[in-house]
Amino acid sequence: MTQQKKNYVLPIAMMFALFAMISFVTGLTNPLGLIVKEQFQAANWMTQLGNAANFIAYAFMGLPAGMMLKRIGYKKTALTAVAVGFIGVGIQVLSGQMDYQPGELTVFWIYLTGAFVSGFSMCMLNAVVNPLLNTLAGGGKKGNQLIQFGGSLNSISATIVPVLGGYLIGTISQDTRISDANPALFIAMAVSYTHLTLPTT
């Protein structure tokens, strides 16, 4: 029994990290929205489209995520979600490397596509982390405790994102571009890659 519990330490730790990752990737849409406003001289409502795209993806992915859980299980669904998140953030990085003409919104739409794909990942991860933590803990009171702790990490990450984003991106001005957010986006990609390469058993 002791050996079995030890085997659960890494999966539980990874679920905690995924809780934080969900909040971190979602929170990046706020500073990116401010950058979009300056780079494209966008209207205020357009600055929230990245955040909206992230959450609209939940409406499209909620049911498929549940079907994936039933068909391929927690582990493969989580790995798929992390891979999708890596791609989504990668698309946002790509948008920051593209040339554009003033008034042209192609780069903006590519950025929104990345935010939308990232939303797919966050939805899938949300579908995995809560029930899997509960299962790993054996359900009951201990399962609830682990979920509450994971939720606390999610909240802490949400608090850290604006501070870390401000440090990595710096003061946002008319000269700020999406590419200036690359350090923060690279961190999100690195976290995703780490989860893809770590053993899950």
What does each of the following model-derived ranges do?
Residues 147-165:
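Glycine-rich segments within core transmembrane alpha-helices of 12-TM secondary carriers
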Residues 106-124:
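Hydrophobic core of transmembrane alpha-helices in multi-pass small-molecule transporters
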Residues 84-101:
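C-terminal ends and interior cores of transmembrane alpha-helices
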Residues 194-200:
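Conserved small/polar residues in nucleotide/adenosyl-binding loops
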Residues 123-149:
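Cytoplasmic helix-loop-helix junction between adjacent transmembrane helices
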Residues 17-36:
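Extracytoplasmic
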Residues 52-66:
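Central cavity-lining transmembrane alpha-helices of secondary-active solute carriers
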